[in-house]
Structure formats: structure tokens, C-alpha cells
Amino acid sequence: GDVYKRQSDERLKLKQRIVHDVLEKYKNIPKDDAIGILSSVGGFEFTCIVGVILGAAANNALVIIDGFNTSACALVAKTLVPQAMDYVMASHLSAEKAAKSSLENLGLEAYVDLGLCLGEASGGSIQMGMLDLAVHMYLAVTGGKA
């Protein structure tokens, strides 16, 4: 119990120190310099997700973001191409502290709040099931006519 708590506290302090150091190092990057922010602190995975969002929007395809990390990517995409948000949907309201404000900044609303914070796209999986059901019901009611 005590050993685990001490290790958890130490890991949290290390993470906080790393975040502080990164913010200090890159404090001069303007907030609207999406490429500068992404290239400094985003990493390969975040860059790929931003590309998926922009590519989907360019092809009139929907992207479901799932959790805070993908919300951060969507914020970068929005800075680059604000119209891309017309093709982004939030799967759920993550339990992470900044989730609500990030969705508000994106102009998105979460359809469900399940307290998820798993990092396994579980919210997106639930949202896909809900969308599939909604389309199925719509087609049943309209006789298959769009």
C-alpha cells in the first residue's frame, strides 16, 4: 500500500516536472502557431491524427475523436483549417480534467458522459454502435430512402 502510493506520488511529480519543463522550453511559441506547437510537443502519433482529421474533412468523411489526446489533435486541426470541425464528432465526455474545456473550444458536444478514461477507444466504439443503430432506425422508418 505505502510503497505503491509513494511510487505513484513520485511518478506524478516526475510527470508534473516534465510538463512544466516542456511548457517553459516552448513558452514563446504563439498559441496560433499550430505547426510550431505540433512539431515541438506533438509527436508522430499526434501529427498523424491531425492529418487524418484534415484528410477526412477534405473528403467529406466523419472523424470521431475519443478522449483528450484526440481532442488536442482536433484543436491543432481546427487552428489550421477551422472548417474541418464540420466533420468531427466527439464520442464522449472523457473523465480527464481538461476534456470539457477542449470540447467547448472545438465547438463540439459530447453525446454521452460515461466517466471513461481508458485510452482504448472505448468511447469511439460505443459511439459507432450508437450511430449504426441510428442509421438502421432511420432506414427502417423511411423504407431505406435517404
Question: Which residues does each predicted region cover?
Answer:
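Flexible, glycine/charged-enriched surface loops at secondary-structure junctions
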Residues: 26-37, 60-67, 115, 140-146
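Conserved active-site and cofactor/substrate-binding residues in soluble primary-metabolism enzymes
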Residues: 10-18, 44-51, 68-72, 93-97, ...
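Short, small-residue-biased leader/transition segments that mark boundaries at the very start
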Residues: 1-4
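Hydrophobic alpha-helical bundle architecture
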Residues: 51-71, 75-90, 110-116
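Terminal helix/beta-alpha structural elements that buttress the NAD(P)+-binding lobe
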Residues: 7
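Active-site-proximal loop->helix
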Residues: 12-17, 76-81, 99-106
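Active-site rim loops that border cofactor/substrate pockets in soluble metabolic enzymes
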Residues: 15-55
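Internal helix-turn-beta structural module
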Residues: 96-143
